[in-house]
């Protein structure tokens, strides 16, 4: 289970260090677990970075990427999964007063990075 592995890894982190999780949680039940684990450890989730782009932009970029699993049907499934799983996840974090940093993913990679840094700084997360 991902949660068990994550708990083991987090236990080895120096307390003064920050941890960035990429791609976890992906479901509300995982988010609820993470919120509980953070609270139990006396920590907090300091911010969520949500990078968004219009579906047509994402579709075009994924098709250009050329990975074997980047087929239109598979990509459309990912869009449905986003609506079903990720949007409720963001709503859960918002109800728990976790800052959600909205980033425009349609920009260049360097502009996205700059916007993430600015958002984290504005949220009080030192990077």
Would you name each region that the model predicts?
Residues 1-36:
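ATP-dependent small-molecule kinase phosphotransfer cores
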Residues 1-8, 69-115:
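Small-molecule kinase domains that catalyze NTP-dependent phosphoryl transfer to phosphate-bearing small molecules
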Residues 9, 33-41, 92, 115, ...:
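Alpha-helical structural signal in soluble globular domains
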Residues 10-17, 40-43, 123-126:
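Glycine-rich phosphate-binding loop signature in dinucleotide/nucleotide-binding domains
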Residues 18, 33-86:
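A glycine- and Lys/Arg-enriched "phosphate-lid" helix/loop adjacent to the NTP-binding pocket
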Residues 22, 49-52, 102-104:
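Conserved beta-strand segments of the P-loop GTPase G domain that flank and frequently precede/overlap
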Residues 25-29, 52-59, 108-110:
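Conserved nucleotide-binding/hydrolysis micro-motifs of P-loop NTPases
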Residues 28-31, 104-126:
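Amphipathic, charged alpha-helical segments and their helix-to-coil junctions
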């Amino acid at each position: 289970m991902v949660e068990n592995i994550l708990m083991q890894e987090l236990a080895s982190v120096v307390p003064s260090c920050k941890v960035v999780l990429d791609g976890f949680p992906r479901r509300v039940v995982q988010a609820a677990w993470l919120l509980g684990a953070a609270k139990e450890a006396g920590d907090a989730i300091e911010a969520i970075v949500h990078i968004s782009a219009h579906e047509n932009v994402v579709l075009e970029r994924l098709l250009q990427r050329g990975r074997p699993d980047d087929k239109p049907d598979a990509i459309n499934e990912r869009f449905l999964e986003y609506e079903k799983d990720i949007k409720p996840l963001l709503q859960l974090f918002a109800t728990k007063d976790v800052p959600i940093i909205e980033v425009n993913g349609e920009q260049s990679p360097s502009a996205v990075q700059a916007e993430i840094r600015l958002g984290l700084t504005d949220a009080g997360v030192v990077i």
